[in-house]
Structure formats: structure tokens, C-alpha cells
């Protein structure tokens, strides 16, 4: 009498071994609505612990909202030829610089609207070396907010609490 339930349980367990879930994630309709933004390599960013422009580009690309265009190296004080950036397909351009001063890094950044030929944002902060990456995330947040109208979440932290 006990062998029948045991056999049924064994059969169910053997059948379950072969079963596995396949997870498939599709992101549709993102590429046609992406905002093209050019992000220049920040002047002297190789002196900082974090490569500012690389962090910013990665944040914007991973959001799915932006199509990042490589702008090469530029300084935040360089003259901007808006028609050149429009012809390259960029709706916005982010430029910046990083300078070390007394053990801190002065990070400067500007965001331009290439269609309206106008400056949208500027930011300048002196940060400790360990916060250069966080500053890059904050710049990505600012770009996200200025171009979408929604607050960015790249510099936020996620907390997971269990009871």
C-alpha cells in the first residue's frame, strides 16, 4: 500500500528534474524613441580614479532612453559648433573637465541643446577621490532630468529589507 504513493512521488520528482523555466526578456520599441546625446571625454579625466565620461555613457545607455554618440575629447571651455553636432545627429551635447586640486577633484560639466543652440545645465563640484564615480552618476542624473523631465536614479542606492 505504501509503495504506490512512493512510486507516484518518485515519478513526479523525476518528471520535475527535466523541467526548467526559460526566462526571456524582450525590450520593444525603445530604439525608435531614443534621444541622441553626445558625451565628450572629459578633459583631464584620466587623472581621476573614475573615468567620468565612461560612467555617464554607461548610465545613459543602460536607461534605454538615450542613444549615446561618441563625441571624442572636448573641454567644457571649448567653443561649441552646434551645427556640427546637429549634423552628427545629436540633440544634446555633454562636455566637462576634471582637475585635481589639493587632493580633491574639481569636476565641471555643461549640457547643451544642439537644436536650440542653448546651454541647458552646468555643474561644478569639488569632490574627494572616492566620490568621483558618484559625481559621474549625479551628472548622468542631471542629463536624464534635463532631457526627459523625470528625475534620474543613477546616483541612488537600493535597500532591500527582509523580516
Question: Positions of the model-derived regions?
Answer:
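Short beta-strand->alpha-helix linker/helix-N-cap micro-motif
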Residues: 26-85, 94, 98-100
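Bacterial N-terminal signal peptides that target proteins for export
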Residues: 1-8
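A short, compositionally biased domain-edge/stem linker segment
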Residues: 21-29, 144-147
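Extended surface/linker regions that mediate inter-domain or inter-protein docking
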Residues: 152, 160-163
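Structural signature of eukaryotic scaffold interfaces centered on beta-propeller domains
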Residues: 141-154
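N-terminal signal peptide c-region/cleavage motif recognized by signal peptidases
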Residues: 16-18
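Residue position within the beta-strands of beta-propeller blades
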Residues: 95, 158-161
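Amphipathic beta-strand/beta-sheet edge segments enriched in Tyr/Trp
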Residues: 23, 78-142
Amino acid at each position: 500500500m505504501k509503495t504506490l504513493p512512493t512510486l507516484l512521488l518518485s515519478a513526479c520528482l523525476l518528471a520535475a528534474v527535466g523541467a526548467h523555466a526559460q526566462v526571456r526578456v524582450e525590450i520593444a520599441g525603445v530604439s525608435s524613441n531614443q534621444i541622441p546625446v553626445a558625451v565628450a571625454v572629459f578633459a583631464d579625466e584620466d587623472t581621476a580614479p573614475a573615468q567620468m565620461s565612461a560612467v555617464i555613457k554607461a548610465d545613459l545607455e543602460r536607461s534605454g532612453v538615450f542613444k549615446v554618440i561618441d563625441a571624442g575629447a572636448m573641454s567644457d571651455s571649448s567653443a561649441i559648433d552646434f551645427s556640427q553636432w546637429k549634423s552628427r545627429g545629436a540633440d544634446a551635447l555633454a562636455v566637462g573637465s576634471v582637475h585635481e586640486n589639493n587632493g580633491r577633484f574639481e569636476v565641471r560639466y555643461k549640457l547643451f541643446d544642439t537644436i536650440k543652440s542653448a546651454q541647458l545645465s552646468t555643474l561644478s563640484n569639488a569632490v574627494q577621490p572616492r566620490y568621483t564615480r558618484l559625481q559621474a552618476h549625479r551628472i548622468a542624473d542631471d542629463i536624464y532630468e534635463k532631457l526627459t523631465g523625470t528625475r534620474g536614479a543613477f546616483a541612488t542606492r537600493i535597500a532591500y529589507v527582509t523580516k
